[in-house]
Design a protein with these regions (language model features):
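Class II aminoacyl-tRNA synthetase catalytic cores and aaRS-like
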Residues: 1-149
Length: 149
């Protein structure tokens, strides 16, 4: 199965298998259901892991995955009214590709402020924040437009 970028996943892929890779933004537990917010360079998506439909070994490993770790998820796209995008990925298989250091030196979730000197020291993490990344995407498009003019 070929990898899909998150921005390529649409409602048209409902009930279709997809393979996505990205950084873990957040993991929430709600009883026998785990929600993973997965982010790649294009967008983010909610992934759902049900205890009943997943190997116990994989399900028990998910809450231990640290923020900003890189994972690979295979699953089916399902329509969902609760998901921000109107659909989510139901996890069928999960593989941790790279564990992140814990605790992270800076908060990438934008829930708290980090001093500029610390952000510059860990610029590689700071650039993963959607707000900062969008600045560089806009800047790139402007430079590209000017150079093509």
């Amino acid at each position: 199965m070929d990898r899909s970028f998150i921005s390529e996943i649409t409602e048209d892929l409902n009930n279709k298998e997809v393979l996505v890779k990205g950084w873990v933004s957040d993991i929430r537990t709600l009883g026998k259901v785990l929600f993973i917010i997965l982010r790649d360079k294009t967008d983010s998506i909610q992934c759902v892991a049900h205890k009943d439909s997943l190997k116990e070994e994989i399900f028990n490993k998910i809450p231990k995955i640290s923020q900003e770790s890189v994972i690979e998820i295979e699953g089916k796209v399902k329509a969902s009214k609760q998901a921000k995008k109107g659909f989510e990925i139901v996890v069928e298989n999960l593989k941790v590709l790279a564990e992140s250091m814990t605790p992270l030196p800076i908060d990438t979730s934008e829930k708290s402020k980090t001093m500029i000197d610390k952000r510059l020291d860990f610029r590689f993490l700071d650039l993963r924040r959607p707000k900062i990344a969008s600045i560089f995407k806009i800047r790139s498009k402007v430079f590209n437009f000017v150079s093509n003019f």
